[in-house]
Every structure is written in structure tokens, then in C-alpha cells.
């Protein structure tokens, strides 16, 4: 799951032509936090994951590769 998160963040950030610093500013965190997440050293909190997903224009499920199954 973490590997998918790091890859998705990097790909989506590149797609939007954002630097780590720009992503961090828009999400309200430090560039160091974004770097730690992309390096796989940190898993974001729920709130941060929601903010990152919004800035990156993806769903949280897409960030974490969560498959939703119908009941």
C-alpha cells in the first residue's frame, strides 16, 4: 500500500507540474513531510491524505490503491 501511495503521489504531482514545495504549500504541510511520504518513510494522517488527494485531484482510494467492494 505504501509503495502505491509513493508512486501515485509522484506521478500525480508530475502530471500537475508541481514541485514538492508547491504540493506541500497547497496541502498545508512542509516540503519535508511531502518528501518523507514520497520516500516511503511516513504514512500521512487521514486528514493529510484527504488534503493531498484534493490537491492531486484524485480520490483517497486512488492514493492508497483501496478497492471498494459492493456489499
Predicted regions and their residues:
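A short, Lys/Arg-rich alpha-helix, primarily the initiator
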Residues: 1-15
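Alpha-helical residues within the helix-turn-helix
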Residues: 14, 25, 54
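Short alpha-helical DNA-recognition segment
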Residues: 17-36
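DNA major-groove recognition helix of helix-turn-helix/homeodomain DNA-binding modules
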Residues: 28, 47-62
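Key DNA-contact positions within bacterial/archaeal DNA-binding proteins
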Residues: 32, 42, 61
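Short, charged recognition helix plus adjacent turn
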Residues: 54, 64-71
Amino acid at each position: 500500500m505504501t509503495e502505491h501511495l509513493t508512486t501515485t503521489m509522484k506521478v500525480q504531482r508530475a502530471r500537475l507540474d508541481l514541485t514538492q514545495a508547491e504540493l506541500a504549500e497547497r496541502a498545508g504541510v512542509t516540503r519535508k513531510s511531502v518528501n518523507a511520504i514520497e520516500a516511503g518513510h511516513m504514512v500521512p494522517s487521514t486528514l493529510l491524505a484527504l488534503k493531498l488527494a484534493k490537491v492531486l485531484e484524485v480520490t483517497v482510494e486512488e492514493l492508497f490503491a483501496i478497492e471498494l467492494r459492493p456489499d
